Amino acid sequence: MGINSIMSANDILNRVAVEIGIAPVTDPYSSTDPTFVKMKTLLNIAGEELVNAHPWEILLKQHQIITTSADTGIYTLPDDFSHIVNQTGWERSQRVPLGGPRTSQEWAYLKGRDFANSSVYIQFRFADGKFQIYPAPPPDGLDIDFEYVSTGWVRSATADPFTYTDEIIAGDQVPIFNKTLISRYLKVKMLEATGFDTTKAQADFNQIFAFLTGTEKGAPVLDAGGGRGFPYLGYSNIPDTGFGL
């Protein structure tokens, strides 16, 4: 998002305060006023919910795992991992997509049939907060890559370099969501928490949410003739032999 589309936590708190009839203050994040104390908590809740509401381009990150034959096949996820972007998992050394994420039942089937010595292409699942692959131990030198949504929706005030976290603890920190989006969502949260009607505020939020989720990334030209889309995982991008179960 552009630099002009974001603002500090203090500015967002004052912006929403004015909209709901509260006088702005110099440093709302340090204020002990009960209204601002409540708004600080709700601002963090709003940001956490927005992370999971849409695969925002600004939160996308790439993760890479290079395997060794000494690995267990269980890998720690990044500290800021929220969730994987579906169909972005690839094993790049052999240029094939990862199979998964597998359910518990499918995982039990793989292990029960013992395909470890067969030419099975890499399967994965998430369990116990870890990224697991099969077969395990894996072959040496696999290059496993996938995209994920980061929980780091809060940026530091200074760029030396910027750091990102999942919680606002100071008023000069900057939520990287569009300022109108997060302001309108905080307003909904605040009105709801204080028992006021949220109909208009919710409609305003829904409008900006729909606009931003529809325009933050490019889109293909629609073909009314039913043209073929690119099959990310299919016969055109996996080998003819040496894969599968």
Language-model-detected regions and their locations in the chain:
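Glycine-enriched, solvent-exposed interface loops adjoining structured elements
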Residues: 1-245
